[in-house]
Regions:
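A generic signature of intrinsically disordered, low-complexity regions enriched in glycine/proline
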Residues: 14, 71, 132-133
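Residue positions that mark polypeptide boundaries
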Residues: 1, 144-145
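Structural alpha/beta surface segment adjacent to cysteine/selenocysteine redox centers
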Residues: 18-120
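Local sequence-structure signature of Cys/Sec-based thiol-disulfide redox active-site neighborhoods
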Residues: 1-22
Length: 145
């Protein structure tokens, strides 16, 4: 049995969403298995004395433009037509990431993760609003929140 690969994720990261959308194909093609590990990306940035690319490159327009270009290329290559930048970005994901841990304990993490990523990066919902998060869950996940 192959050692699983940890996929550290935060729903607030568009890059994590993009990775999530292609991991299934990688698993099918290679036989690898990814274990999803919820983290708070903002906390990781703080711990490592780092900043998000949006903040780090705010004063470097060409770098931000190239980052967006690469994102568009990735989206096109992998046919991720539903992806859209969230108008509420950046979003405080503390609550929905805590629920990701609970969803793992309850055995409904894959469905919860799909719903949260869809709400955040396909539907452009304000996932910082607890009621919107709860409504998103009620639509598709057997998780009482």
């Amino acid at each position: 049995m192959k050692t699983p690969i940890q996929f550290l994720f935060d729903f607030g990261s568009p890059n994590a969403y993009l990775c999530h959308k292609v991991l299934g194909a990688i698993e099918s093609r290679t036989g690898a298995h990814f274990d999803y590990v919820p983290i708070l990306l903002g906390g990781l940035f703080k711990l490592s004395n780092n900043r998000s690319p949006v903040q780090a490159f705010a004063d470097i327009p060409n770098k931000l433009a190239y980052d967006r270009l690469e994102m568009r290329r990735f989206v096109a290559r992998h046919e991720l037509a539903k992806f859209t930048l969230n108008p509420y970005f950046p979003v405080n994901t503390l609550k929905i990431m805590r629920l990701a841990v609970a969803a793992q304990d309850l055995g409904c993490a894959p469905a919860y993760i799909d719903v949260m990523y869809s709400a955040m990066w396909e539907q452009g919902r304000n996932m910082d609003d607890g009621e919107i998060g709860r409504a998103s869950c009620r639509e598709r996940v057997s998780l009482v929140v």
